[in-house]
A protein has these predicted regions:
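Non-catalytic alpha-helical scaffolds and adjoining flexible linkers that form interface surfaces
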Residues: 1-14, 21-204
Length: 204
């Protein structure tokens, strides 16, 4: 089996409870501490086996880390781990997992190889919002429920709000409209992407 580690909880004696996003499900497993075990961390893609035990959760064994081309790039790995960490609270209560999430991460790993990491993640997140039906291309203001036709702001989940309805950073309407339609950040400057990134980190 293969999957991405989206949550790690330490338990007694350096053992871990690990949550893995696989193709069709979220897997929670127990990882015993051992000197010969490979290191694991948030965001790692691993190949693994599960061993059923008398406990409530299976034991994680035969773990092999599947590296990324950029895994030693501090900035890319740091941003990747911050993004991956958001998937656990977002998906933890879902019983049947859509393969979309696994393959979205698979594609993102490849894109990050070639592109600025924050831009790549923001573009991937737009696709996630669209898949979940949460991408508000109607541009109705969250607060006053009137359609936005000029400058706007964005809040958590990239929800659009009239600039006059909030004190948040103002974006050019046409730029955000293009972002939502084309799912590309090439027309946005670095400061705008940085602000989108800060919004994204508030939660998926």
């Amino acid at each position: 089996m293969q999957g991405y580690i989206i949550d790690i909880k330490p338990v007694k004696d350096d053992d871990l409870i690990v949550t893995i996003l696989s193709e069709n499900e979220l897997i929670t497993a127990y990882r015993f501490y051992g000197a010969r075990h490979s290191n694991i961390n948030i965001g790692y893609k691993i190949d693994f086996e599960l061993e059923n035990t008398r406990a409530n959760i299976p034991r994680l064994k035969d773990v092999i880390q599947l590296g990324f081309p950029w895994i030693l790039d501090y900035e890319k790995m740091y941003c990747w781990q911050r993004y991956i960490r958001l998937f656990y609270p977002h998906l933890k209560d879902i019983e049947e997992l859509d393969p979309f999430y696994f393959y979205c991460l698979e594609k993102l790993v490849y894109v990050i190889t070639k592109q600025n990491v924050q831009r790549a993640i923001c573009e991937s997140y737009i696709s996630l919002l669209e898949h979940e039906g949460r991408l508000h291309t109607d541009f109705e203001c969250l607060l006053c429920e009137i359609v936005i036709e000029d400058d706007l702001s964005l809040v958590r989940g990239f929800l659009p709000i009239h600039a006059r309805c909030t004190k948040a950073k103002i974006f050019d309407f046409k730029k955000i409209q293009e972002l939502f339609i084309k799912k590309k950040t090439t027309h946005l400057n670095d400061n705008e992407v940085e602000y989108l990134w800060d919004i994204l980190l508030q939660g998926l």
